[in-house]
Amino acid sequence: MSQEFEVGHSAVPNAATTTVEKPIASPTTTTIQPPWTKRHLNLILIGDVNSGKTAFLDLLANVCAGVPLEDFKPVHKAANERDSSQPGSNTNVPEFYTISCANGTEVNILDTPGLGDPRGIEIDFQNRNAIVKAIQRHFETVNAIIILANGSLYHTMGVEFVIKTISHIFPHSIANNIAFVLTMVDDPTMIVFDRSYLPDELKDAKVWGINNPFSLWMKYQKKIAENPRTLPEDFLEEMNDSIHRDYPKTLTTLSEVFQFLDKCEVQPMESAYSLKERPDIEAPVPNVIAGMN
């Protein structure tokens, strides 16, 4: 099985482009069923710091391209990632990816730095303006915005700040094109997500929970490559079995996500403008009111 990755820098500062080609088909390839019908999908992944946006991008890129779980590999540009042990967003600048899918369609995804960066409001302000510039460069229309959040944490402040930022960038009509994906969710019935603080326009937004199999598989590969190994063999076997056992559930969830995306009416992006014109966007504070008007 072969994959080809082509990386190029955008002419716009703080934006980059990566193309992910679909692999040669394999009899063991598992894809999203039923397939979606739109030939092109434009998505924006956005969320607070450490919400798992880039890992979710890697999952989408592998699954959409028809790559079997055992062959999962990172597709994100490693040079665009900071040391995860350091505070702040791991993603340096917005990165644009084009994924050639196994069903012949194309998915364009903008991966973005985390909002609410603890390194300070200046970093956060730069990141938000870079997101706007990347949107203006790459998208005339957008199918959906996926807001990611750590589903293992009970928090509202970070997500509220993300929603407030979105409300200042996009037209009011984008509300019907917004959905949530909660990461690090072992059991979908135990999702920690409070809708009460959401603006009325998002009270009925779609919410899905996943425990990203791409992240789990990368951790498993790292553990079995250790010499000497730090985990007992039976633990590693259980880890492998668990990932494979839960993977079909993830495919079911992704199928629901793409059926939602397929039904979204495209939204024009000509009204997205620089946040420099909106100085009223502040750092995240308690009780942020994120009206979509």
Name these PLM-found stretches.
Residues 1-6, 213:
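PEST-like, low-complexity acidic/proline-rich intrinsically disordered segments
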Residues 5-13, 20, 24:
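Hydrophobic/aromatic hotspots within intrinsically disordered, low-complexity regions
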Residues 17-18, 23-24, 29-263:
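Globular "head" domains of long coiled-coil molecular machines
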Residues 12, 32, 36, 293:
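Cys/His-coordinated Zn2+-binding motifs and related Cys/His-dense segments, i.e., zinc fingers/knuckles
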Residues 264-293:
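Long, non-membrane, amphipathic alpha-helices that form coiled-coils
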